Amino acid sequence: MARLAGVDIPREKRLEIALTYIYGVGKTRAHETLAATGISADVRVKDLTDAQLVELRDYIEGNYKVEGDLRREVAADIRRKVEIGSYEGLRHRKGLPVRGQRTKTNARTRKGPKRTVAGKKKAR
């Protein structure tokens, strides 16, 4: 397996797809990277030369914030919003959706499993 930005990328996949295994590199950035380095998107990772791997590694690490650095930056941004008490920070603290989605129904991913609440007692 080839290593780029501290990630083992799969040998059998096309390079354009394999690059998306790096956190912070999606399809668009993978395409931009390949265009800038002049490497074909259809090449399999196993067919890359060492020089091409070095060129890819240098380009990605030089131009993009990826993996640990990006994760740290995102976590720091969230921590800062929580500390200053912004609306987004409060939503993060409460574990609710941050970007204005409805919460009366749905939002189960952020809220977690349902906690059942006792219903009304029947009047006699």
Curated annotation (Swiss-Prot):
| Disordered: annotated span | 94-124
Source organism's superkingdom?
Bacteria
* One GO molecular-function entry: structural constituent of ribosome
Q: Which InterPro entries match?
A: Rbsml_uS13_C, Ribosomal_uS13, Ribosomal_uS13-like_H2TH, Ribosomal_uS13_bac-type, Ribosomal_uS13_CS
Q: Which UniProt keywords apply?
A: Ribonucleoprotein, Ribosomal protein, RNA-binding, rRNA-binding, tRNA-binding
Enumerate the Gene Ontology biological process terms.
translation
Q: Which Pfam families match?
A: Ribosomal_S13 (PF00416)
Name the GO cellular-component terms.
Answer: cytosol; small ribosomal subunit
**Which protein family is it in?**
Belongs to the universal ribosomal protein uS13 family.
Looking up NCBIfam families in the UniProt record yields: uS13_bact
Give the record's subunit note.
Part of the 30S ribosomal subunit. Forms a loose heterodimer with protein S19. Forms two bridges to the 50S subunit in the 70S ribosome.
Q: What does this protein do?
A: Located at the top of the head of the 30S subunit, it contacts several helices of the 16S rRNA. In the 70S ribosome it contacts the 23S rRNA (bridge B1a) and protein L5 of the 50S subunit (bridge B1b), connecting the 2 subunits; these bridges are implicated in subunit movement. Contacts the tRNAs in the A and P-sites.
Q: Could you tell me what this protein is called?
A: Small ribosomal subunit protein uS13
Species source reads Pseudarthrobacter chlorophenolicus (strain ATCC 700700 / DSM 12829 / CIP 107037 / JCM 12360 / KCTC 9906 / NCIMB 13794 / A6) (Arthrobacter chlorophenolicus)
Per the record, the gene is: rpsM
